[in-house]
UniProtKB/Swiss-Prot annotation:
Name assigned to this protein: Chaperonin GroEL
Compartments where found: Cytoplasm
Keyword tags: ATP-binding, Chaperone, Cytoplasm, Isomerase, Nucleotide-binding
Gene name of the encoded protein: groEL
Listed EC numbers: 5.6.1.7
Role of this protein: Together with its co-chaperonin GroES, plays an essential role in assisting protein folding. The GroEL-GroES system forms a nano-cage that allows encapsulation of the non-native substrate proteins and provides a physical environment optimized to promote and accelerate protein folding.
InterPro entries: Chaperonin_Cpn60_CS (IPR018370), Cpn60/GroEL (IPR001844), Cpn60/GroEL/TCP-1 (IPR002423), GroEL-like_apical_dom_sf (IPR027409), GROEL-like_equatorial_sf (IPR027413), TCP-1-like_intermed_sf (IPR027410)
Principal cellular location given in the protein's record: cytoplasm
Record-linked NCBIfam families: GroEL, PRK00013.1, PRK12849.1, PRK12850.1, PRK12851.1
Amino acid sequence: MAAKQITFNADARMALKRGVDKLADAVKVTLGPKGRNVIIEKKFGAPTVTKDGVTVAKEIELEDKLENVGAQMVKEVASKTSDVAGDGTTTATVLAQAILTAGLKSVTAGANPMDLKRGIDKAVEVVVAELRKMSQEVQDKNRIAQVATISANGDKAIGQLIADAFEKVGKDGVITVEEAKGTETTLEVVEGMQFDRGYLSPYFVTNPDTMEAVLEDAYILIHDKKISAMKDLLPILEKVVQTGRPLLIIAEDVEGEALATLVVNKLRGVLKVAAVKAPGFGDRRKAMLEDIAILTGGTVISEEKGYRLENATLDYLGQAERIIVDKDNTTIVGGKGDPAQIKARANQIRQQIEETTSDYDREKLQERLAKLAGGVAVLKIGAATEPEMKEKKARVEDALHATRAAVEEGIVPGGGVAYIRAIAALDKVEVENEDQKIGVQIVQRALEEPLRQIAANAGWEGSIVVQRVKEGQGDFGFNAQTEEFGNLLEQGVIDPTKVARTALENAASVAGLLLTTEAVVAEKPEKEKAAAPSPGDMDF
């Protein structure tokens, strides 16, 4: 085990602060619409050019072990904020630095760090409550476009695309981001329910040009086991043939005699049919089959429920206006299920989303909800070069995340103004002693910092801008894009409430931990061992 270097008290805190400052100074130049770029050198490939705070933070690793501990703590602020809210990473870093800087001065002057932290925590609670009071709901497409535009660093085209995507699939829909083949950025919407299983035999194709099987006004047979014997399938097939309507079979697998008979009947024109494997695996497969059954008004023919395939009737089959099957995907459009049952199923999935602790499960549940409730939109990002593509894709993902946050918790005026308006509420905070009061004052000062930095990046004097905004009321603030003062909500300069809230909570949490640190244990840098002399250097 390598030897450790232990540092105490002021030395430890000052070393941590140096690390925090190095990281924060590199990150905060990106804040606001006039934020500057940071170029990140890569070991392989082209350098990355970014204006995204968390991307800069993640790349920073300091040589000094103690300083690096401080930098890593603040990096955690940025990435946690990005994970939860999708934006606000730079704001969180600026706030953490401001709280830590003011806090360390007070600790050095003799204040009790624990009381400072209690004061900071009380202040944050009050500010969060104030932000919630200020918050306005986001409903119309225009507002969604404004939120997305700001998160995408002022790119109106991206903002509009995201607003279109939300309009098409609703707030429960899934919106994914992919790289496009060309330079155009486009939006594709898949209506209905799509799952990633294609036809089991190319002989099921009805349109040889597109290699798709298209079934209009079709029945759907949903079975959770393999179908290999034709005798099991025959009774229901005969009933479907009499109706003259096409049939889609979804089962664990269709093989052997059953598959061969289906193909022969399809080729002879006796029955328009296609067969696909059931989506998913294990318990998720059962749940997805149940989703398809509810969406189409059918029943999963499962022996666990006491249903047998040979006894199936037309009442067990689901129905849909149109089904498109290609070699990779199946899309069911216009399922004829009972709307009340579909809604109840969607609510059940929403409940599971709230209760689950696994991010993976949550993502999969959200996909299922989207397929039931709205649909899936795919944003295909185009760019001229690889570095531009990466940068643009990261911006779109951020903007998407932030827009979801806005739809979830509402919006507040942007440009650091919401924090300025919350400062007054801190005058009334009840504290137990003088040090806690100092903690509250530290947060009051720190809340001005994001606006100062936005103004400074736009080439203005921060304190003059802060004073001018303080003199105004409500949504009055500084629009760094146009370099004018005015009503920020009307001008579309807005932040999701969740972003403003998460940035402050995470910043105060880490700054509070750093302030109450008394010792840091870090690995000692290993001394380079002298290389053994090579035989050529020896005298014989």
